[in-house]
Each structure stands twice: as C-alpha cells, then as structure tokens.
Amino acid sequence: MNEQIIMLGTGSAMVTECYNTCFLLKSKNDYLLVDAGGGNGILSVIKKSGVDWNSIKTMFITHSHTDHILGAVWVIRQISALMNSGKYDGNFNIYCHDECVDSITAICNHTLAPKFLKNINTKIFINEVKDGEKQNAGSIRLTFFDIF
C-alpha cells in the first residue's frame, strides 16, 4: 500500500492527554505534514510514528490558531538543525495563507537562533498560497481552497 494517513494528534486546543490535531499523509516515499500542533510535542509524536525527518519535505498549515501553528516553529528548528549537520537532503517547503506566513515568520525571527534562521529562504521556504492554487508536495498534488 503506497498511501497512508498517520494521525499524530487528535485533540483540540486545550488538550492535556493527547496532542493537537495534526497528521502525516504518505504517498510513495513522500510525507506531507498537515498542521504541527501547539508546541514541541510535535517532535515526540513524529519520533513515535517512526517516520524519518528526511522523508518529510512539505508541511501545510491550515490556519494560524496556536494549536495548529506553534509546532511549526519546532519543525523548522529540527529540520534546520538536520540541514546544518548534513542530515537532511533537499529543501523543506511550508504552504499556508498570508496570515500564517506572517505569524510563522515573526515567531521564528523572535525565537530561533541565527544558526537555524539562516536556512529560511535558502533551504526552508514559507510559501503563501491562494484560493484555487495547485502545488506538488512530492508525489501528492494539492489544491488549496479558502473555506472562510
């Protein structure tokens, strides 16, 4: 079976017994991370999933609520650290709407060390998407749409 969904979290904003809603979509050897939850718990749930960080090349953030976006900073930090140590191949793309781009960029700029920030816009790309836009996430074809 080539396609799979790996649930990393199923909880809402104020969970204490599980992680916030986020998941990995697998197609062939590509993984797409959808949302990142509310903090550094994303690191342990990905570790528990057994998925190699090097196989996650794309992340999609649905909206900028804290329980969906704050884990993104930890994902960026982890992938940047792997890039810096030569353990991550290629680029990492994040897709989200304009408000998320601004939020992720601001949080990263205020919290991450320069050694992690240096990969943003060179190897880690935070891409704004518009309603109806299409992108490839490895072998997964995405069509973005606005529900508001």
Give the label of every model feature segment.
Residues 15, 24, 50, 84-86, ...:
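Short secondary-structure boundary/capping segments
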Residues 40-95:
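Active-site metal-binding motif and surrounding structural segment of the metallo-beta-lactamase
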Residues 38-39, 65, 100, 131:
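A generic "binding-loop/recognition-motif" signal
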